[in-house]
Amino acid sequence: MSKQSSSYHVPVTYIYSVEGNIGSGKSTFVRFLKENLNDPNVVFVQEPVDVWETIKDKNGETILTKFYRSNEDYAFAFQMMAYISRLSILKKTILENPGKTIITERCVETDKNVFAKMLYDSGKIKEVEYQIYLKWFDEFSSYLHVDGTIYIYTTPQKCSDRVQKRNRTGESIPIEYLESCHRYHDAWLNNSNKPLLTLLNEFDVEEHEHMDKLEKFKKFINLNIKQ
């Protein structure tokens, strides 16, 4: 899907973000879309967890492990790292794929409206740190306009079950944290003025059973409209 600017014939890039709680099934859904959409004009961006895992202390412990063990000590550092890595990969993808549609697993707006805000509200990111974070956000994210959001809606308990089942290194997440994430996602997305497609993902199904979600997704982003 691509669009030409009528005045200057400059290709316009569309960005759609797949959102949801930790363990909601975002990564699985994005992989499924990548395998089944079959459109050369659509590019996919996974959450840069692999980049986060390269940030380690001298003992080899990752920032992700440190953050989940001690939110207050590493909240600001982790959120800055998450923001910078997400911004970097999206910027690179946009420059390399002019005029294409980008499907990203989360976006910089998620960091601001869910994770950074939640940590600030709970006192784990200090006032001065939060002001610095917002300065960074306002300065560098203005050109990363998201055109629509796909919300993978899953209850916190189901997310917790999936997190425990996948057992990623360093990912020990209390149910209370997931419940808070759920509330902040709901508050942000349900009050956003951006187009929103909500897909329920409460049940564990095989990937081939996501075909109904694929059809809803295709309709949502108008892949069949020639522009």
Where are these regions (language model features)?
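P-loop (Walker A) phosphate-binding loop of NTP-binding proteins
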Residues: 21
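Conserved substrate/cofactor phosphate-moiety recognition/catalytic segment
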Residues: 35-79
